[in-house]
Each structure stands twice: as structure tokens, then as C-alpha cells.
Amino acid sequence: DIRQNTERGGLFLDIRIEKTDRAIEKAFLELRSKMPLEKIKIKDLCALACVNKSTFYAHYEDIYALSNRLEDKLIADILASVSAVELYPVRTEALTRELFRAFVQNKTAVNILFADSRQGIFANRIEKGLRESLTVQDPTFANDPKRGILLSFCVQGCFYAFTNNSSRMDEKHLVDLLAEIARAAQKVMM
């Protein structure tokens, strides 16, 4: 998205490219909320985004590349919001609270991009990203099965609670319960 401005000798962000990307992404999310990824036609997406097919293909290889890009952005945003939590030593209570809040803040995008059979992919990618962060902070993390299991328990359990119990319990009580369970699991594991 950065283009060389030869007249001024500097770099500038081409606002038209950014606006086109936003229009395509918005149209994609609207269509994706109504149908599976495999059913979305580029023709329909372009009509909704008010762009030509050639414009779409100048930005993305195909519909899957667009979906992957949006998934990657969402995962990165969630991981960035959780990275403020000190992950080593694994503070399961704080991690669980922040993860749940990040899931809630991104609920619409999570439910659209990772619907149906893609739900497991989402939780696994979050876990993988956290595992990589923890290993960078402490290389011994990768070879510690107890901490790895504890991380899996926190991420997968938190996501399960988010997807299956968010409507049954108010957010504060659910987050408090998850934090209590995570704290107890940490005591058992360590």
C-alpha cells in the first residue's frame, strides 16, 4: 500500500487503495455473514463493494486469499490485545480474562470469519500464537508439557465458554468463573 511519490521524493499511503480494501472487506464480511465461504462469488462481492473484478484481483489472488487476510488480521489483533498480559510465568487468570474480553470485543468478526467448521481453526491459531510468544519470552516453554497443557486448557476452554455459554450467563460472572477455573488449574499443574 505504500507507493513511491516521485514528484515529492517521499512515500505516501495511497488512500484510494485503502478505501478499496475497506470496501472489499466490508462487502466480504456482509456476504460471509449470510453464506459459507465456498458460496461467495467474486461477481457478487465486487457488485456489493462497487469495484471491478480486475480491481479485486489486483488486491487479492482469490476469495480464499481475502478470507485468510481478514483471519490473519483478526488473530493478530486478538494476540496483540492479550500480549499486554505478562505471559511468563503463565498467569492463567489474567490470560483467561484478557482472552475472553478480546473474544467478546471481536465477537462479530469471530462469528463471521470462523463460523461452523472453522471454529476449531480459530482457537488453534490463537493457541499457536500465544505458544510462539511464550517460547520467545522463555525458550524452555516449548519443552514444558505442563505449561503447554495449561495454555491449551486456558485458550480452548475460554473459547468453548465464549461460543457456548456467552448467552447463558452475563459476561462478568462468566469471566470470573473462567478466571477461577484457570487459577485452580494452574495450582494443580504447577
Descriptions of predicted regions:
Residues 4-7, 164-190:
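C-terminal peripheral helix-coil segments that are non-catalytic and often amphipathic
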Residues 31-65:
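Helix-turn-helix
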Residues 2-35:
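Basic, helix-initiating cap at the start of DNA-binding domains
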Residues 81-85, 110-113, 165-169, 189:
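Secondary-structure edge/capping motif, primarily at the C-terminal ends of alpha-helices
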Residues 89-127, 131:
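Helical hydrophobic small-molecule/effector-binding pocket
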Residues 22-30, 48, 65-84, 94, ...:
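Alpha-helical structural segments
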Residues 32-35, 142, 146, 167:
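Cytosolic nucleotide-binding catalytic cores of signal-transduction proteins
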Residues 117-141, 145-156, 183:
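Amphipathic alpha-helical packing segments from all-alpha helical-bundle domains
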